[in-house]
Amino acid sequence: LYRDCQSLVEAIQKILFYNGLLWQVGHRHVGLGRMDLVLYPYYKKDVEANRLNYEQAKGLLKEMCLLLGKDSPMKSLNLIGDSGQYIILGGVDKNGKNTDNELTRMFLELFEELRIPDPKLIFRVNEETPMDTWKRSIRCLANGCGSPLFMNETLIMENMVKFGYRNEDVWNVGTSACWEPLIIGKSSDQNNPFISILACNALKKALTEMEDELDYGGLLQLVKRNLAEETRSVVVDKDYDYSPIMSLFNESCIRSGKDFAHQGSDYMYQGAQLLGLPNLVNSLLNIKKYVYEQGLVSLGICREIVQTDYENHLDIKQLFKSANDKKFGLCDEYVLRLSQELIGTVSETIGKLTANGYNVKFGLSSPSYISRGKVASATLDGRNAGEPFAVHISPLSSTIDIAEVLDFASSLSYPVNCLNGNVVDYVIP
């Protein structure tokens, strides 16, 4: 611990030692950083000195990954494997050059073989990512382990600079927990310190407030107003404890002489998360079609459904769930516009707020889609009370294929402050 590592095995041991120490002092979601970039010099030195070959190095990484995942149930929060133990692969260095190397491929091979859910891989990709590495990543993902997640680093880094991160720092983008971007070694960003912004609360409140003669445009404006109020209610200043051990690993803290959680880092942006956007969009699409355009359902029935969980209205539940040909995830002009307007409402509201003196970012992904769903009432997209909300930027309909979902996600315009994780999840049977 008192000197630089002299070999790959020493580097791995040091990482495991400090990783264990961080968990023991109460830190959770301890990310592992850019392991292929960090470990490669030690691997290269060992190979050149004939101390190690490819398979032996792969064996060392295997033991490291198995050890990290051994206590996954204890480390996990909402779901088993939700430990935040992410290994980041690929991406560019500070000179803009791709860092893919033998360890990048080694990690991908290893996870393809082990099929473990924890730790996980994040693969930073760009236009120069080698095709061979892409193919290895797809093979790894296809085995069902959930790794790697793909990070569109070019777009993310551009938006980080626009938001306030320095251009010379964003090459070293990492993640806090699962997908929320930050700068490794210079950030103390808290990317999910607030309860999630529950999008469907805006419609539920609107239904209780509105008059039945209000037209759809008026309802939509009321929903937007309530969504802004919901957003303002969750963004608050937080009282953080001191963290001497974490401060030792933050170069900004060492330079400033201040604690990690008390203005020692170069960046301390707080992050909010929008939960259930697909549910709200589909609910509004159903109201537009079946209440205002076709007159099949009244607003009174909609209120009753939310209050009674579709009691005596199973036919309407099926109608709302399956019949509408316009759904979140489809590249339909109005679906995209409605989604964009709701995202814009949150963005505009967040843009006027601060937390602990710093600007706030938000994302369209939230890990609480199960826990918040358990205590939420029914929604007008066919979801029963207690059921999970939609996962991130993902369709609720199995008829929308992955290509269309990706087209939809790429067709959205993400505001500069919509930077706290925008994940497309898709389950392939």
Each model region followed by its residue ranges:
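Conserved catalytic cores of very large enzyme subunits
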Residues: L1-P429
